[in-house]
Amino acid sequence: KKYNFFLKRYMKYKDFKKIESIVADETLQRLERTPVPTFVTHRTFEIFSRIIAIPKNLGEIPLGGFLFASSQNDVYSLFNLFLKIGRKEDVDSLSAANVLAILAFFKREILRLTKELNDTTPPQSSEEREAAQGLTNVGLFGLIDVISQRQHISTEEAARLPISLVLQFLKIDKNKVLFQRNLNNIYKSKKI
């Protein structure tokens, strides 16, 4: 049976993990909807501390990091990737409410960026679908190769490009394809 818990404001994430399986879904959803903090205090070995700012969005993460993050569901991997908090113990010492709010924010941003990536694909005509027969769907990891060829850079350099810049490249390419299609349709209609 699941229970509704009133979580103490300063409950640590390591303590929350012990009771997570019996926490009601409503409580988890409420925690995930709490405002994302603007920063967290990272304490290393409980001695040194530094303030880490939470980004307003994940548009500036590298393409390779985004692709890695979109395949991850592990709290510690995401905190290491986005906030550079690499030790499990350091994440466990953070407030549970903050960890859950930040994790929900990361997931929302990954979904938003994935949707934006999917929206950059121009719609295919039936003739194009027939000609391509699945050849044009390169997947997320093929995207690095496409960007490296487009920009004439190595795949390592392409993986380091910010996802926001990659989205701009893809939007420009989509607009070029749509423009060319419209132009061809105008030429066809004027010939008849």
State what each model feature region is:
Residues 1-192:
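An amphipathic, hydrophobic-aromatic interaction surface with interspersed Lys/Arg
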